[in-house]
Amino acid sequence: MKRILSAFMCAALIAVSLFAFAGCSKSEQADYKIVMITDGGNVADGAYNQSAWNGVKAFAEEAGVSYRYYQPKVQENEKLSLETAEQYIDLAVKKGAEYIILPSDVFEVAVYDKAPLYNNVKFILVDGTPHPQGDDTDAYIDNVMCISFNSLQSGFIAGYEAVLSGNTKLGYLGSVKSKTSSLYGAGFVQGAQYAADQLGIPVSMDYADMILLF
């Protein structure tokens, strides 16, 4: 599943470079042309952030452009604050980013607030759509591309395949508390149970209470 997500990220980034943001004028080499900001999780989490980062690396190295990531500090409730998200977007722009990858719906409001201020920067928001704080009405901004995956379906397939591969003691650990992580976890449990019912075998499931939200 991680490799599949990485492939999707590579394809999305390549698509962006080829047509979505075509016509951008060339500029001097930025400090870091492509910047990914995580949702607070690290890029070796074995989950969503790592998949996204692998995709960013693969594309950037093939294209021969500079890249890096930032891992913001989350609050005590394991969530990334709006203020922190916006500070890291400002930092990325200050460091010369031309493309900012945001692999989580926790950036929806931050992108809504910041993207119009940096119209020469291209934003890629994964599993989210920009909207104002306190208002879920989607906004469409010229320099923002939104890429959505069905997290529930992806989790279901992963759980189903895990049991079909012979695993009967399973666990799920989300990177941080978020809607996407929760949906993926819920799908994982459902897929594992569906496969267990088909095979007629018992399957146990453990999870981290602080992270997984059902």
Where are the language model's segments positioned?
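A residue-level marker of the well-folded mature domains of exported/periplasmic proteins
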Residues: K26-F214
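Short, low-complexity disordered leader/linker segments with a strong preference
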Residues: M1-K33
